[in-house]
């Protein structure tokens, strides 16, 4: 497509901006091959190709490439249904959380109901696991969501048939039914993963408990 000069103030395309967006789309659509070429300057030709068979796992690995990881491979969970959900998670030794959310490949930088469902689900799963395995004792308080998300890098991608966007920039998902769908999916799929991978669960919970103690 070509931009309409009667609408846009500038018609100059920025290669780096387009490159970043196409890389993002390739991460979100496993196996999709995208090529971008800049042929405007014969002396400075640019070309990038993107194809990620790992999908969201590759996205998280890209985001964490310069960070020290607590567990070697991202945790990947997915479920089809009314609202298909894909999530990849990996913990690092960092103190901040980095969660990226997408709806139909649109970057919802303000979050929304899919992010809320994820936060509720992951808080429940890790607290339930810690209680069941006596990592949290009866006298201990539950871990807060912020403790559980410290050091987390996550990418959440959902497909919604009729998305409702809110916020000043329309980058916040407002569909109320998505909260429960994502929360239930996280509980249903992540809980068995932790049971089957106790070393990963233990490493993550050590990080969460350390964050909780530091906060107190």
What kind of feature is each model-predicted range?
Residues 1-216:
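GHKL-family ATPase ATP-binding module
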């Amino acid at each position: 497509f070509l931009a309409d000069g009667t609408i846009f103030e500038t018609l100059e395309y920025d290669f780096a901006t387009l490159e970043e967006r196409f890389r993002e789309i390739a991460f979100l659509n496993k196996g999709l091959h995208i090529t971008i070429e800049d042929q405007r300057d014969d002396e400075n030709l640019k070309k990038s190709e993107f194809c990620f068979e790992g999908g969201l796992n590759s996205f998280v690995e890209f985001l964490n490439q310069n960070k020290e990881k607590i567990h070697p491979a991202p945790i990947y969970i997915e479920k089809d249904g009314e609202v298909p959900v894909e999530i990849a998670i990996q913990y690092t030794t960092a103190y901040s959380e980095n969660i990226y959310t997408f709806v139909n490949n649109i970057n919802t930088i303000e979050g929304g109901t899919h992010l809320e469902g994820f936060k509720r689900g992951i808080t429940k799963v890790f607290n339930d696991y810690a209680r069941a395995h006596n990592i949290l004792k009866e006298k201990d308080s539950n871990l807060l969501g912020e403790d559980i998300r410290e050091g987390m890098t996550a990418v959440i991608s959902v497909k919604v048939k009729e998305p409702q966007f809110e916020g000043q920039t329309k980058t916040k998902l407002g569909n109320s039914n998505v909260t429960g769908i994502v929360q239930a999916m996280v509980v249903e799929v992540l809980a068995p993963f932790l049971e089957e991978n106790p070393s990963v669960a233990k490493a993550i919970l050590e990080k969460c408990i350390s964050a909780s103690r530091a906060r107190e």
